[in-house]
């Protein structure tokens, strides 16, 4: 049994259990495997203060999940503690904490940025490589998994797109995140968990509802899967020329001609998510931004 599994069974976080281990002289990390002696020592320490005649079980009981419980996929470009430039990363972490507290299973999908690889690379489990469509070509996505504090983190790796000094601000951002969006949809069926809902965040992942409707509509894994678009900041909407649809997203220009992705004379990727997601959620910042005159002009 690993540290994070023991922590989950005893209702605590990996960080809390690691601290306890260090207090009693057991040097471990969240991914470390506990031997029988360490398990017994930890169990005695945690159960200290209870009736001394009580039988202490060194193997915690497995808590059966309710049949009603469904797994949520949360697709985002920032999430603490891995990477965060502001509120988006904090919001993702808070969502994870609340979802687990509510007794639901959660998968968070993130790009495997350079800074994440440098800190967490050795603790991740490589799953497989998959070919991902980018326009009329393909790029390879390397899938990695890390379970921490009862959350399954899915990292999408590609050296060309994500081994860079910054997260955003590149001319090919649309291509980078279109690759990430499609890679997530390709990867989820391989995790062996049925998904009930996919949450996406801002324009960087708002392509998922669109791609899902265009290319995965009849995929058995995605039948009855709902999508929620969280809008955190309307200042960034993903404005691009129409060529982005066939050349990057790999979908027909007809989705511009019919108005689904079009705003003015450009493709607006945030709009594509608004038009195709099952539901939309706005935070306080984006709600206030809607009141600004320039938002009505666009």
Identify the function of each model-found stretch.
Residues 1-64:
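Charge-dense, low-complexity intrinsically disordered segments
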Residues 64-298:
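Catalytic cores of nucleotide-sugar-dependent glycosyltransferases that transfer UDP/GDP/TDP-activated
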């Amino acid at each position: 049994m690993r540290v994070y599994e023991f922590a989950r069974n005893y209702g605590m976080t990996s960080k809390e259990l690691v601290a306890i281990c260090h207090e009693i002289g057991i040097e471990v990390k969240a991914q470390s495997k506990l031997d029988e002696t360490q398990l017994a020592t930890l169990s005695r320490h945690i159960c200290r203060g209870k009736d001394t005649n009580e039988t202490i079980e060194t193997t915690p009981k497995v808590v059966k999940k309710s049949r009603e419980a469904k797994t949520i996929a949360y697709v985002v470009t920032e999430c603490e503690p891995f990477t965060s430039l502001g509120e988006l990363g904090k919001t993702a972490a808070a969502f994870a904490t609340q979802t687990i507290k509510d007794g639901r299973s959660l998968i968070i999908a993130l790009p495997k940025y350079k800074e994440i690889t440098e800190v967490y690379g050795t603790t991740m489990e490589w799953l497989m490589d998959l070919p991902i469509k980018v326009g009329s070509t393909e790029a390879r996505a390397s899938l990695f998994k890390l379970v921490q504090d009862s959350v399954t983190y899915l990292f999408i790796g590609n050296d060309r797109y994500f081994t860079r000094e910054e997260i955003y601000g590149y001319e090919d951002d649309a291509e980078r995140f279109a690759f990430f969006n499609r890679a997530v949809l390709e990867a989820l069926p391989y995790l062996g968990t049925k998904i009930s809902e996919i949450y996406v965040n801002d324009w960087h992942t708002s392509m998922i509802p669109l791609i899902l409707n265009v290319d995965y509509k009849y995929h058995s894994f995605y039948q009855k899967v709902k999508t929620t678009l969280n809008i955190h900041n309307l200042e960034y909407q993903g404005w691009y020329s129409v060529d982005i649809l066939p050349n990057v997203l790999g979908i027909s220009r007809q989705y511009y001609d019919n108005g689904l992705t079009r705003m003015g004379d450009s493709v607006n990727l945030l709009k594509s998510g608004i038009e195709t997601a099952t539901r939309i959620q706005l935070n306080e910042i984006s709600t206030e931004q809607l009141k600004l005159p320039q938002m009505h002009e666009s």
